[in-house]
Structures are given as structure tokens and as C-alpha cells.
Amino acid sequence: MTQISGSLVAIVTPMHEDGSLDFPSLRSLIDWHIAEGTDGIVIVGTSGESPTVSVDEHRELIRVTVEQVNKRIPVIAGTGGNSTTEAVELTAYAKSVGADASLQVVPYYNKPTQEGMYLHFRKVAESVDLPVILYNVPGRTVADMSVDTMLRLAQVPGVMGVKEATGNIDRAAQLIKAAPASFKIYSGDDPTAVALMLLGGHGNISVTANVAPRAMHDLCAAAMRGDVETARRIHMQLLSVHKNLFVESNPIPVKWALQAMGKMAGGIRLPLTPLAAQYQEVVRASLQDAGLLS
């Protein structure tokens, strides 16, 4: 199994102003991330606007990412959803083109029970020989996977870990304490990622890494080796970035930030809209404060 740890960018999906996919910019972003030390690419997750890409686009985004990365760092394909059958099919495709793992979000809208979540994720893991990272983000899905359900799933072959995005450090500590050593716990919440990693977490699936790949790599490396002072310093440097990349729904602010940095165009798909004018200077100031924009 490929080692997956450190700063894992929840990469955006670049789009032209008309909303069409911008593959040249995606390839350029990937190369920039690798040069800046990013430890893994998570493609077509929340930050990648997975709900508004078609099935064909979803597949092509995974294929192009795997091709561009070319085995330099791990690729984690966002292939989850609220249909178990579709999640299995998309995960099988990701495996066929060479992804290293899949990210499986808690099924949203249909609000499964804890048993339903368990059976859903077990079905995906048993159907496709590709490591599964669970993704718990109740702020998006409404349904919240319990620690007990995560621990049950940790016993399922093929389930390698979880992206825990609640930001609840007490919950993360309980999970880290009780989980087997083979089960990896990743933060999915930039403001609390340092704390989770200092408790024994294995990395951070990060929005901030989109704009600060080198800093996030250094932060994760420091936290995971127990270098509290370095991790604290970088965290404080990025504090306003962590906060202000969520002044509107992710990935609205981070896509605007990348456009301001000259990394891509600012296209985004409805029902998401471009960053409101009153927040643009807030985000710009955060980037400048962190030394990411002159």
C-alpha cells in the first residue's frame, strides 16, 4: 500500500470563465504542488466541486491527474457519493487508471443510519481493491459518522483511514487512541490540523495548501515529528488564511485567491458564485499577511 501522509491538498478544479474545465491549469497546479513539497493530491473532492461535474468530467479529472502526477506523489480520487452503486463504479474507474486511494464521503441528503454508513463503505471496500479513506464532514452531508462506526470500519480490509473534518479535537483524540495503528487519521480542518497531528494524526487534507503548498508541507512535517515551535509558528503565519478561505462556501474564496495569485482563471459553476466583492479585500489581505501575495 502506498504511504499517504503529510500535506495532502484538496485541489480545486480549475475552470474557464464559462465554467468549462481548464485542464492545462490543472496540470500546471499539479506540477507547482509537487515542486513546492505537497505530499499528495486529492482530486474531485469538496474543493474540486464534485457535485457539479458530470460523470465523464469526473473520470477525466481523475485520469488527467494520475497522468500528470506520474507516480511522483500519491493521488487520492474523490469517488464517494450518496449512491453506493455509483461510488463502486467510480472507484473501480479510479483504480483502473492508477489512483493510489479513494476518498469516500459520508452519503449526503439521504441521511443513512450508522449501520447504513457501515454497509455502504464496506461494500465499496470489498468491491474494489483500492484503499479507502473515509470522509466525515457533517457540515456538508448532514449525516455524522460516529467514532464507533469509524472503528468498526477500521477492521474492514481495504479501509485505510478517515478524513475527520469536524474540527472536534476531543473526538479526534478518542479516535486516535482507540484505532489500530494501521488506521490513518487525517485532519480535514485546517484551523485544528496541528492539534490533530500532534496527537498522532497522519496528515492534513487541506484547503489552505491550495495557496500555500510549501508552508503546509512544512507545517505538517513539523507537527508529525513533534516540533511544536515550528508548527506553531507556521500555523500563526497562516491563521488568517485558514479563517478567510471560508468567508463564503469552499471553494469560492480559494478559487478567487488562486486567480489573484495568477495561477488560474476564476471560473466556478452554479449554484456556487464568484467571491462577493466585500470579501475580496479580506482574502487578499490574508494572502498578503501570510506572504503569499505581494
UniProtKB/Swiss-Prot annotation:
- Organism domain of life: Bacteria
What keywords would UniProt list here?
Answer: Amino-acid biosynthesis, Cytoplasm, Diaminopimelate biosynthesis, Lyase, Lysine biosynthesis, Schiff base
Per the record, the pathway is: Amino-acid biosynthesis; L-lysine biosynthesis via DAP pathway; (S)-tetrahydrodipicolinate from L-aspartate: step 3/4
Molecular function (GO) terms for this protein are: 4-hydroxy-tetrahydrodipicolinate synthase activity
Q: Where is this site: Part of a proton relay during catalysis?
A: 46, 109
Q: What class of enzyme is it?
A: lyase
Give the subcellular location: Cytoplasm
Q: Which GO terms describe its biological process?
A: diaminopimelate biosynthetic process; lysine biosynthetic process via diaminopimelate
Instruction: Keyword check for NAD, yes or no.
Output: no
Q: Where is the active site?
A: 135, 163
- Per the UniProt entry, the Enzyme Commission number(s) are 4.3.3.7
Q: Name one GO cellular component term.
A: cytosol
Gene3D superfamilies hit by this protein: Aldolase class I (3.20.20.70)
* Pfam families in alphabetical order: DHDPS
Chain positions recorded as pyruvate binding sites: 47, 205
According to UniProt, the reaction catalysed is: L-aspartate 4-semialdehyde + pyruvate = (2S,4S)-4-hydroxy-2,3,4,5-tetrahydrodipicolinate + H2O + H(+)
Q: Please state the protein's primary subcellular location.
A: cytoplasm
Function summary: Catalyzes the condensation of (S)-aspartate-beta-semialdehyde [(S)-ASA] and pyruvate to 4-hydroxy-tetrahydrodipicolinate (HTPA).
Q: Give the similarity note.
A: Belongs to the DapA family.
The annotated subunit structure for this chain is: Homotetramer; dimer of dimers.
Q: Would you tell me the protein name for this molecule?
A: 4-hydroxy-tetrahydrodipicolinate synthase
